[in-house]
UniProtKB/Swiss-Prot annotation:
Residues 87-505 form the Peptidase A1 domain. It is found in: Secreted. Involved in the processing and degradation of storage proteins. GO terms for molecular function: aspartic-type endopeptidase activity. Keywords: Aspartyl protease, Disulfide bond, Glycoprotein, Hydrolase, Protease, Repeat, Secreted, Signal, Zymogen. GO terms for biological process: lipid metabolic process; proteolysis; response to cadmium ion. The gene is APA3. This is Aspartic proteinase A3. Residues 317-419 form the Saposin B-type domain. Residues 26-69 form a propeptide. SUPFAM superfamilies: Acid proteases (SSF50630), Saposin (SSF47862). Transmembrane segments: none annotated. It holds the Pfam family Asp. It comes from Arabidopsis thaliana (Mouse-ear cress). Belongs to the peptidase A1 family.
Amino acid sequence: MGTRFQSFLLVFLLSCLILISTASCERNGDGTIRIGLKKRKLDRSNRLASQLFLKNRGSHWSPKHYFRLNDENADMVPLKNYLDAQYYGDITIGTPPQKFTVIFDTGSSNLWIPSTKCYLSVACYFHSKYKASQSSSYRKNGKPASIRYGTGAISGYFSNDDVKVGDIVVKEQEFIEATSEPGITFLLAKFDGILGLGFKEISVGNSTPVWYNMVEKGLVKEPIFSFWLNRNPKDPEGGEIVFGGVDPKHFKGEHTFVPVTHKGYWQFDMGDLQIAGKPTGYCAKGCSAIADSGTSLLTGPSTVITMINHAIGAQGIVSRECKAVVDQYGKTMLNSLLAQEDPKKVCSQIGVCAYDGTQSVSMGIQSVVDDGTSGLLNQAMCSACEMAAVWMESELTQNQTQERILAYAAELCDHIPTQNQQSAVDCGRVSSMPIVTFSIGGRSFDLTPQDYIFKIGEGVESQCTSGFTAMDIAPPRGPLWILGDIFMGPYHTVFDYGKGRVGFAKAA
């Protein structure tokens, strides 16, 4: 009786938590393969799980580890909170085919799915698992694999089998059978695994990505793939990924292309960012950005995210160190900036930072809100000072008075974001929030409040959060912007592997 009840309970839980839907695929006369994407509706349970994941992760994670690759024991991919991902598609593996729902992720490069040998991770019991013994095309590999995700890791081993994406069959594709998955992130996820579309340079175990094999084996017409993400919440169609080309009906005008500057990620250079038409000045000399389909969020340096938070009224951390810097050193900093001093060196010149040529604001806002030792306090004061210098410089370019500049900097001290977390906003103010503009390839790309604000529920029960999150990446990799679905939704995105470039056009 007990066994029957446990079996019934397991089936019931599976039915409640697994997303059951189908994704269409189509081979067209133009030689392209189109994969229909499913879109997960935003809900409070996943948003809560996302917050718990970030809270549990926070004390163990440091931005300086974000881009560490090829560790002697494990590889590192961009740290993601995949619970924020909204778009998925289906693939099959093996003969006969076994279906899996995956995120098509341009921010990583491996294909991994749960293994039937995943016994001890609860997450595996709530997702489809690959059964090697039931596939006649399976080829044993056995090479161990581990991908670290902050506080946990996906671990397992490599196997080889036929992978079908749409109508394309990639023979003997190497992929990871995950035998261990970290806690809540993958337990509540509406997908089974990840299909990475990044470059081989960041592939765990130097495994050849699925996309590379598509191109090298001549399975696609052109070495291009493109994303259209449907942002209409009332439309059942979630979007589409096209392998081998683009779908003209999903964009307007011409794409603006920029070259990939660092292979591994789809990374490129961008210009300055504007808030309500006002330049921030932070990226006036250029910043790096990554087009990342594996996240719904848009992540950038704390300095600029704080300015956005202030403009949209987002809640943040009140930083005592930041306020102390503005109060004690604000006028001195302004005098240095008026004397045309480099904002990055102002804080060392007034003695707040020990500038050694590498210190910069990108060391992170984590230190700004730390308490404890004098070393942490000094670092917090330095980071706060460097951010304030950028804010003041931005206001000086707008010919603001010294009194207004100091008041503005003090106000921003109340809106510093929590590292890598979203901020709550007033749903009633969304229509009056500013347009945020990115400069890419000499062209302006606007994001409206409807693009960057997530709304859950209706009426008095509604909750709104900003899609902008802060994460500081130290030089030489940073400062860095990660443009997720918030950006790729309004802008159709082309990933041109053949010419090493990324293109954006207004989505239709």
